[in-house]
């Protein structure tokens, strides 16, 4: 088994702790060390959403979290679960040593969301139940409990002559039973309201020359196009320099991916099933999928020459991305709430709208839209003022903070009906055509009623 860089870093940190503390009982020290790491990670993942909720922002729409599980663990829910326990048990659970303890705990009414219940009746039982000869008393207790529901279902099955599968005599599943299925991907759950004072572990200020090259590479990559300037700078300063010798493997096909790379110097060859398929040089990037989710590497990358690479890990990137999105939601939330036009939107709809908005700046005298142009965006004024003018007529309207424009072209699929020019420094939030149709919902009808080009408005 080839360990990922993330796993190697974790083990290296543990080794340093061992060398520094020189524990007498290594096993106990290891258990305490990794339990503490797990606790810190859980605290980080489950950090409170109170700041966001106080602003009316829904960070993770549709996610019920452990609250839903506790509700499901109520007496009524458990009763329903017991009725279905035997007939609808997962088909592979009997052969899975990792899931056996979950079944046993649920049978005894344990709440799987409570971190304290994972440390159960016997030392180590919560961590090592099932299949590994640990926590045996807990397993025996689960096996000797009399389940009247199971007996009742058994008698029904016998009457119908339906053979009942035995977990004792069943043959274990073959190791490659899932080999032809599509590989799954995953990603960590993060809570961005915990990031206020967070600094990336590998944060280092880059030189002007390094910044120039890295900004060019980052700027043309689709993952970073929508980041604001502060987030882009944070990404660049979080990149870690890696020196790779000629012939050294950088990533291996099928391995877990957790790093994104930018080539500063040298060339990298890519192989698919031992067949060379591509070569990248300075300024190129690879490994983008690793920043989005934990997916296996699609190819093998080998340094064709000595290389200087810059690497960014997935967790750092996602923290930067979510921190920026979180701040953006908080920033736009009060602004969107203050607009009479958007009062009909729910908190959830406002959160989605805030995510889709982009910020643009204009200096006094600069045109935002021009009469006759194709309309692609809807605009909301965050601060500043602008004039609306028409050819042959002159200025027809003056706009200020909280006003909007650009809706006519999107509502009626027409060219721009007027020119909007900034009269002071202007900051606007823009929404693209697809977002306008998809996210504004009932607001679109209000805009139609106020459309100045309507026949009954003339």
Swiss-Prot record:
3',5'-cyclic AMP 2 binds at residues 341-457. Tetramer, composed of 2 regulatory (R) and 2 catalytic (C) subunits. In the presence of cAMP it dissociates into 2 active monomeric C subunits and an R dimer. It holds the Pfam family cNMP_binding. It comes from Eremothecium gossypii (strain ATCC 10895 / CBS 109.51 / FGSC 9923 / NRRL Y-1056). The gene is PKAR. GO terms for cellular component: cAMP-dependent protein kinase complex; chromatin; cytosol; nucleus; plasma membrane. The lineage of its organism: Eukaryota, Fungi, Dikarya, Ascomycota, Saccharomycotina. Residues 28-222 are annotated as: Dimerization and phosphorylation. Keywords: cAMP, cAMP-binding, Nucleotide-binding, Phosphoprotein, Repeat. The modification Phosphoserine is found at residue 184. Belongs to the cAMP-dependent kinase regulatory chain family. 3',5'-cyclic AMP 1 binds at residues 223-338. This is cAMP-dependent protein kinase regulatory subunit. One of its GO terms (biological process) is positive regulation of protein export from nucleus. GO terms for molecular function: cAMP binding; cAMP-dependent protein kinase inhibitor activity; identical protein binding; protein kinase A catalytic subunit binding. SMART domains: cNMP (SM00100), RIIa (SM00394).
């Amino acid at each position: 088994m080839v360990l990922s860089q993330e796993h190697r870093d974790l083990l290296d940190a543990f080794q340093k702790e061992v060398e520094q503390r020189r524990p007498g009982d290594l096993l106990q020290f290891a258990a305490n060390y990794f339990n503490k790491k797990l606790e810190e990670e859980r605290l980080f993942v489950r950090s409170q959403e109170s700041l966001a909720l106080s602003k009316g922002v829904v960070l993770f729409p549709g996610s019920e979290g452990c609250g839903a599980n506790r509700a499901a663990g109520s007496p009524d829910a458990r009763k329903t679960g017991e009725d279905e326990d035997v007939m609808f048990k997962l088909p592979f659970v009997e052969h899975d040593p990792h899931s056996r303890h979950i079944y046993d705990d649920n049978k005894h009414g344990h709440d799987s969301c409570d971190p304290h219940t994972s440390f159960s009746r016997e030392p180590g039982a919560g961590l090592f139940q099932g299949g590994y000869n640990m926590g045996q008393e807990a397993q025996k207790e689960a096996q000797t409990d009399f389940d009247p529901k199971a007996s009742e279902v058994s008698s029904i099955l016998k009457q119908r002559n339906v053979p009942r599968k035995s977990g004792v005599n069943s043959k274990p599943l073959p190791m490659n039973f899932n080999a032809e299925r599509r590989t799954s991907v995953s990603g960590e759950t993060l809570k961005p309201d915990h990031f206020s004072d967070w600094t990336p572990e590998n944060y280092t200020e880059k030189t002007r020359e390094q910044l120039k090259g890295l900004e060019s590479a980052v700027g043309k990559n689709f993952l970073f196009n929508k980041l604001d300037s502060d987030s882009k700078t944070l990404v660049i300063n979080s990149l870690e320099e890696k020196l790779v010798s000629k012939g050294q493997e950088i990533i291996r096909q099928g391995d877990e991916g957790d790093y994104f790379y930018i080539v500063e110097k040298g060339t990298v060859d890519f192989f698919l099933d031992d067949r060379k398929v591509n070569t990248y040089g300075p300024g190129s990037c690879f490994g983008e999928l690793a920043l989005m989710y934990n997916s296996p590497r699609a190819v093998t990358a080998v340094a064709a020459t000595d290389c200087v690479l810059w690497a960014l890990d997935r967790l750092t990137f996602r923290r930067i991305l979510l921190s920026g999105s979180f701040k953006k939601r908080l920033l736009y939330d009060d602004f969107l709430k203050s607009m009479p036009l958007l009062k009909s939107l729910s908190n959830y709809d406002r959160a989605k709208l805030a995510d889709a908005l982009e910020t643009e700046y204009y200096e006094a005298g600069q045109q935002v839209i021009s009469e006759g142009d194709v309309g692609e965006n809807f605009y909301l004024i965050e601060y500043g003022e602008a004039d609306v003018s028409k050819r042959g007529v002159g200025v027809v309207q003056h706009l200020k903070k909280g006003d909007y424009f650009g809706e006519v072209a999107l509502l009626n699929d027409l060219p721009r009906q007027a020119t909007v020019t900034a009269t002071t420094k202007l900051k606007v939030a823009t929404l693209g055509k697809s977002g306008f149709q998809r996210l504004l919902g009932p607001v679109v009808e209000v805009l139609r009623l106020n459309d100045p080009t309507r026949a009954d408005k003339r």
